[in-house]
């Protein structure tokens, strides 16, 4: 399976960038913001800053490696991930990787939002700007991930139906979008997304 256009026209959670697509697809992430955030968004005091930026460059060419296989296995994703490298269409938000559990409709996707950064719409600032412009009507702070700020962001809040879209700021201009879809509800989908997000921070700290 290849990451869908909906994911990445992502127009990536958040990112990647990243968010909101339909629950009928095997997966979706936050679509990329359509343009640079406005000056008011850039200065928005609600946008959390990243105190200790992390370097994602090592994983831009191999985004599937950013999530440890042990973490994926613990979530029952045993099939290889499917890579979508950045391009002008499907990968506009940045490079990503998708996994699925065969026969269950459960999926996990990650997008590294370097494409959003390069367009001047990167990081949580870009997502807050997209929220303010109405592109992503739903945005809510999420628990920090190992000290890194995070948000839930989507076209609408789909957590109750088992689709959790979150973005974690790893630098002020780069966010990583994590999408967990096809779960029973908000608790299990967001727990899975948070577990993957935490493993990504651990990976980046050790890179």
Protein language model regions, located:
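Bacterial N-terminal signal peptides that target proteins for export
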Residues: 1-11
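C-terminal motif of bacterial Sec signal peptides marking the signal peptidase cleavage site
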Residues: 17-20
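A small/polar (G/S/T-enriched), proline-flanked helix-loop surface module common
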Residues: 25-31, 35-207
